[in-house]
Amino acid sequence: ETKSGMVLIIGYMNKDALDQTILTKQGHYWSRSREVLWKKGESSGMVHNVDDILIDDDQDSIWLKVTIEGLGASCHVGYKSCFYRSVNKIDNGEVTLNFTETEKVFDPEVVYPGADNPTKL
């Protein structure tokens, strides 16, 4: 996110997704599981408006700095970022996840009624 510097998502792009992102200045991505080009916010209204596009040194990774429309979240389960948990290792070797975001921005059942949620909580 442009304002906070927060990483919102890791998305995949093909040439069409990159072309559409540059053309429209809105985040477009390639869904590897559905094999379809999609625009972030197409169904939720939480569009990624692109403020800047950065390319890494060997030109195989792209970082979009974005401003989010609508409710201001990027994660389909309701959090601002898809990275809302951190790994915590406990002394006995058990690994747990700690929530770094404790409040959801929206209720996914309201925004995506009837949609399956593949995320493990």
Range-by-range predicted roles:
Residues 1-121:
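Flexible "arm" and connector segments at domain edges
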